[in-house]
Amino acid sequence: IINDSGRISHFNWRNNSEIIAWGASVNPFNSMRKFSSLNKFIIKPLLPIYKKVIGRNSLQGNSKISSLISGDSYLRIDINSGKNSSFGKDILIQDGHPSICPSNANLILSDTYPNDNAICKFFIYDIKDNYIITEEELNSINSFDNTPLRCDLHPKWSYDGSFVSVDTMNDG
């Protein structure tokens, strides 16, 4: 196990020894998730209150309080040392589907889930210089959002890193 926080999703290899992923660093709050009785009797009953306090869900991005409690962010995970470090905390505030550029491992292509206005974004982020190089928006089909029929963008690079593609259900 390279990250025992109880929460890691959407990962991709950056190189032969490093993974990037969305998730939480190991902390006492996240460690509680491993115990089913704590989950059942403490964490799950408190989730509705937690969501009301922060005013959003994980698909809408982290609030400051959410980030402090859960520690959710993009992580660099070194598989040899087990060291986890977060990056882009003030810029990349939402879970996505990261893809590493084959010609430049400092470039991450990722996406967001649709917001309340049915807008989802995909972007290229420079991990070395900590900024978003480019960002595009697409309309999603609102009636499918937050259902099993939704279509996440899942952006991917071409083999040479010259082009990107996204999944979409929009008509243009």
Task: List PLM regions with ranges.
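Beta-propeller domains
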Residues: 1-38, 59-73
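Multi-bladed beta-propeller domains
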Residues: 1-9, 41-49, 78-95, 126-151
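Loop/turn-rich, solvent-exposed surfaces of beta-rich toroidal or solenoidal domains
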Residues: 51-75, 83-131
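Generic alpha-helix signal with a bias toward terminal, lower-confidence helices
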Residues: 12-14, 120, 134-137, 169
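Conserved beta-propeller blade repeats
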Residues: 4-29, 91-111, 142-163
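Short glycine/acidic-enriched loop and turn motifs that connect beta-strands
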Residues: 26-29, 113-118, 170-172
